Amino acid sequence: MDLFPQEPRQIRERIRRYERLLQKEMDEFGQISDGYGKRYLLGPLYLLLGDTTGALSHYEWFEAMFPGDRGHPMHLLCWSLVLYRVGQQAAAATRLRQLVAANRYVLPRLLSGETPVLDLDVEAHPGEVFDFEDVPIELYALWDEEALAWAQTVYDSPEVRQLRSK
């Protein structure tokens, strides 16, 4: 099964299935453990469908259900785009900073369109390469020129420069 289907009908079906499965976990166990990571896929799926409102609703639900969850890089990338699109630039910038703190390579890949040189110490940053490679190309393509220009200003900010130097 592909991570993200291509056809809108299939995307809607995947969204419904994941939402049903998450609700089923909640109903049966009183909590959501979600070992597969469906909670990270719903926002990107809504965005791929062109449903910014649905994506925003998902992220609000996510924040309420998983307040301590740091998210996955592709999840944070899409969350920041949704917030940017609805005019919440400060919150969107916060998500981009969280993305850089979690993975220093996703945002440069978005901005340059090229795979950055991975100069990390795998032992010091376990999972960072895997998470970087785990972001599907379709999610980078969601960003238009205006959003990319805004993301570049966030990337060049003193706060993000400090995060990148760690």
Write out the residue ranges for each language-model feature.
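N-terminal alpha-helical interaction modules that lie
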Residues: M1-G54, A102-K166
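Primarily a tetratricopeptide repeat
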Residues: E13, R20, S57, W61, ...
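Canonical positions in the second alpha-helix
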Residues: E25-E28, F62-M65, L99
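Start-of-helix signal in alpha-solenoid helical-repeat scaffolds, especially tetratricopeptide repeats
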Residues: Y36, P73-M74
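TPR/TPR-like alpha-solenoid signature
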Residues: Y40, L77-W79
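Short coil/turn linking the two alpha-helices of tandem helical-hairpin repeats
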Residues: G50, R70, R85-Q88, D119-L120
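Duplex nucleic acid-engaging cores and interfaces of nucleic-acid transaction enzymes
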Residues: G68, H75
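TPR/TPR-like (Sel1-like) alpha-helical repeat modules
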Residues: L83-P108, V135-I137
